[in-house]
Amino acid sequence: MKVILLKDVPGQGKKGEVVDVAEGYARNYLFPRGLAEEATKGRMKALGDRQKVLAMKEKKAEEEARALAARLKGVTVVVRAKTGEGGRLFGSVNNKDIAEALASQYNIVLDKKKLLLKEPIKQLGMYSVAARLHPNIQAEVRVEVAGE
């Protein structure tokens, strides 16, 4: 029996795939748990349409990420922080501070979770921070931490 998986099913496939399973397995396990539905002509057509829409959205998201990566190339963000002796900061500079500085200085809105900062910055200087804009696209943001 051909079924369309509504969720990932270990050993069978991922969400949206059409798989061939035993009729008893489908009726007694997959259907009651909402893991799959029978693959009728109407549902197959709807699945094809849904996959086309998802592919278009994914392509658009990737194009936007590439454009954002191009905008971030060559950008140096200056983050000002209070300092003590020897260039040590009072507190630290984290990804939230960097995202806010990007927004205020360059009008680039970037979610703080996309900035991959291993640990908060605690000294003055130039740093390179990776930004994961898309699963396939990563950009580098140069950050200059300066004293106030």
UniProtKB/Swiss-Prot annotation:
Supply one GO BP term. Answer: translation
GO molecular function (one): rRNA binding
What keywords are assigned to this protein? Ribonucleoprotein, Ribosomal protein, RNA-binding, rRNA-binding
InterPro entries, alphabetized: Ribosomal_bL9, Ribosomal_bL9/RNase_H1_N, Ribosomal_bL9_bac/chp, Ribosomal_bL9_C, Ribosomal_bL9_C_sf, Ribosomal_bL9_N, Ribosomal_bL9_N_sf
Q: Which residues form a coiled coil?
A: none
User: Which family is it part of?
Assistant: Belongs to the bacterial ribosomal protein bL9 family.
HAMAP family from the UniProt entry: Ribosomal_bL9
Its name, as the record gives it, is Large ribosomal subunit protein bL9
Encoding gene, per UniProt annotation = rplI
